């Protein structure tokens, strides 16, 4: 009986710890700024209609601003490891904002954390510091562009979400990867459409020192059973999707 009591006490401690780590965001507010918790800052505010009511909604990217999450390297470079979150706010005809989606699961991390750990981070298609370009609202869809840098390569992924079934569901994924070794240069591109349940891809392998080139193409139907939601996307979700359907 005592062991059972200790177990439930430990479980309660874990639950409380997670609640302390999570931020409390309001469900409704009259200003976008009201959704930014104390100790956090705005990184991107992107406006556009996401629910076909002809009223501009808001995609808000925020980042914690805690000195404890800054680290100095041996060459005195300062790295910012502060966590980031994505919020989607629907604006109604009364100019009130409603929180309809949020992700604070590490789906998007800071540029410095991504650089050090080879993770995905929001990226401008022009490779500049304007992160507002990494978010695009087009044809009632929300598109997030991310990039991962490697020693001799990179990975670029565009996630396409649509608001349906009262949530932002992933309806498409565009993936590009390139890598160069001492012998080969590899270019891979995949396009997955979860609405039509199709995958189209190409893999181009070229010799660095030779004229040897090998191109593989794939186009197939996929059995889509899982739904991927913006709120529950994680850092490795994109890779897991590719591993699941590219087989």
Predicted regions and their residues:
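Bacterial N-terminal signal peptides
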Residues: 9-19
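N-terminal targeting signals for Sec/Tat export/insertion, comprising classic cleavable signal peptides
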Residues: 30-57
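Beta-propeller blade repeat segments, especially FG-GAP/WD-type strand-to-loop junctions
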Residues: 25-27, 67-104, 160-163
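Acidic, small-residue rich beta-repeat scaffolds with periodic aromatic anchors
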Residues: 120-247
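Blade-edge motifs of beta-propeller repeat domains
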Residues: 22-38, 94-124
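Bacterial N-terminal signal peptides that target proteins for export
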Residues: 1-10
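Short glycine/acidic-enriched loop and turn motifs that connect beta-strands
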Residues: 65-67, 150-151
């Amino acid at each position: 009986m005592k062991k059972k009591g200790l177990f439930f006490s430990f479980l309660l401690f874990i639950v409380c710890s997670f609640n302390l780590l999570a931020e409390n965001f309001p469900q409704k507010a009259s200003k976008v700024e009201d959704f930014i918790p104390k100790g956090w800052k705005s990184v991107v505010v992107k406006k556009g209609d996401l629910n076909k009511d002809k009223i501009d909604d808001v995609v808000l990217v925020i980042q914690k601003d805690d000195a404890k999450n800054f680290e100095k390297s041996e060459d005195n470079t300062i790295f910012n490891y502060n966590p980031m979150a994505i919020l989607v706010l629907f604006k109604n005809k009364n100019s009130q904002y409603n929180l309809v989606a949020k992700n604070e699961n590490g789906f998007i991390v800071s540029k410095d954390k991504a650089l050090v750990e080879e993770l995905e981070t929001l990226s401008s298609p022009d490779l500049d510091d304007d992160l507002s370009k990494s978010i695009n609202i087009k044809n009632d869809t929300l598109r997030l562009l991310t990039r991962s840098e490697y020693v001799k390569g990179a990975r670029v992924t565009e996630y396409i979400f649509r608001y349906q079934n009262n949530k932002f569901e992933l309806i498409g994924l565009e993936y590009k990867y390139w890598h160069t070794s001492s012998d080969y240069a590899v270019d891979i591109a995949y396009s997955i459409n979860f609405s039509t349940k199709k995958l189209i891809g190409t893999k181009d392998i070229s010799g660095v020192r030779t004229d040897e080139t090998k191109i593989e193409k794939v186009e197939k139907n996929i059995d889509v059973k899982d739904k991927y939601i913006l709120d529950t996307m994680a850092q490795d979700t994109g890779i897991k999707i590719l591993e699941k359907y590219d087989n």
